[in-house]
Amino acid sequence: MYSSLNGTGLKPVTRTLKEMGYTNITVVKEQEQPDGNFPTCPYPNPEIQEAMELGMEYAKKCHADLLLATDPDCDRVGIAVKNNIGEYELLTGNQTGLLLLDYICSQRVKHGKMLDDPVMVKTIVTMDMSERIAAHYGLRTINILTGFKFIGEQIGKLEQSSKAASYVFGFEESCGYLTGSYVRDKDGVDGAYMICEMFSYYAAQRISLLDKLEELYKIYGYCLNTLHSYEFNGSAGFTKCRISCRHSAEKSKNSVERRLLKYWIIRPVWMVCRSQMC
């Protein structure tokens, strides 16, 4: 089951999947065509439950095993999978990223195609468990600020040092993934294809993505991640944020070079707060 959430992903995603052999694709009709008003999904973000609900309804009617949804500009992809009781569970970007990282690395090792000095790039708000998976396969982790442009920047730096071929995978917790160095930004088409390949591989062994995720937790440690967004709308919201930032800056003893704060509560539990202007 696939939804473009009334965005641009329909043609590139479905064409790519069909050309790669995934032809049994059902599309969510109400969200098929681009529509900037987003009539069925006021907040077309594949990270959130509300955006995926119509797709889940379709998936349940069609008995689909996997639901894919790309955001309007098709650079991010979210998924929901069927659990043991037939209900659909939305995976977080962190969970999907962990699964993809392990799958890509394990397949490279299995087929003798692991790169020299392999590298995984992630944002600092992305789950730390990914570093343990990367280390298991011999990958070096590069942590960067939030924003996939910084992952692209690292690919550029690797390229300048003649090490672009060492890039294996990059992702951020907001459902952005990139499996190669051919572009400098997250790619929903690439992500959708790799998710389908991974899903098919495990399905052939009668292993669900939820089962595989549980297996990873048992090996590398159980993790919990949640995302909370707080909106400050309009000019009043902007003014409130500006006053708050100025007030905090006046009381701060040291300069803050990044638009985020990371709090270590009880190690390894941490929380990150960051601002984002839309």
Can you name each region flagged by the protein language model?
Residues G21-G78:
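N-terminal small/polar loop signature for handling phosphorylated ligands or for N-terminal nucleophile
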Residues E50-L54, L100, F150:
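Well-ordered alpha-helical segments embedded in enzymatic catalytic cores
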Residues M1-Y22, Q31:
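Active-site pocket-lining segments that scaffold enzyme catalytic pockets across diverse folds
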Residues S4-L10, C74-R76, V125-D128, S235:
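Gly/Ser/Thr-rich loops at beta-strand to alpha-helix junctions
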Residues V13, D75-N94, S130:
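Short Gly/Thr/Asp-enriched flexible loops that form oxyanion-binding sites at enzyme active sites
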Residues T23-V27, E87-S106, G191-M194:
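Gly/Ser/Thr-rich active-site loops/lids in small-molecule metabolic enzymes
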Residues K60, A64-L66, E87-E89, Q107-C278:
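Phosphate-binding and adjacent anionic-ligand microenvironments
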Residues R15-V27, E131-Y137:
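Short helix-loop-beta junction
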